[in-house]
Amino acid sequence: MELADKASFRDAMAHVGAAVNIITTDGPAGRAGFTASAVCSVTDTPPTLLVCLNRSASVWPVFSEHHTLCVNTLAAGQEALSTLFGGKTAMDERFAAADWQTGATGCPRLEAALVSFDCRIDQRVSVGTHDILFCHVVAITRHPEPRGLMWFGRGYHTLMRPAC
């Protein structure tokens, strides 16, 4: 059976909503960050996320040298920061655009993130053009912002937390 073509797959994936995240790291190879929507929960025992990173991305060499990262899930209103980390902007300029703390792993944690998952990279698997990073969560920081930022239909959208 033949595989679907690349264009059809990308068009179909535009119908799947995803949280917008900035993935950060810091260590001997330097500080780096990129925007990602290909992030999801794997299991809660142990708490594990997966992060997909294109091996042709400018940040790949840095992430390939490090064993920790922080998944910073963006809140509504942080579209410009997402765009900045998704482009060709220099790392110093990316990080200068927001306030950061040092997380439990030493990685940059976005102060105004909806939630931040400080992680240790446990396993790497290469599939096609990407590396899949399996990350054990060692610390979680939540922000009271009630609105999340989603990527759907090739654009940003706000998702409201329901009132309890």
Curated annotation (Swiss-Prot):
Phosphoprotein is among the record's keywords: no
GO aspect biological process, one term: uracil catabolic process
GO molecular function annotation: FMN binding; FMN reductase (NADH) activity; FMN reductase [NAD(P)H] activity; riboflavin reductase (NADPH) activity
Keywords noted in UniProt: Flavoprotein, FMN, NAD, Oxidoreductase
Reaction it catalyzes: FMNH2 + NAD(+) = FMN + NADH + 2 H(+)
HAMAP family named among the record's database cross-references: RutF
Function recorded in the entry: Catalyzes the reduction of FMN to FMNH2 which is used to reduce pyrimidine by RutA via the Rut pathway.
Stated family: Belongs to the non-flavoprotein flavin reductase family. RutF subfamily.
Name of the protein this chain belongs to: FMN reductase (NADH) RutF
Organism of this sequence: Klebsiella pneumoniae (strain 342)
Organism classification: Bacteria, Pseudomonadati, Pseudomonadota, Gammaproteobacteria, Enterobacterales
Name of encoding gene: rutF
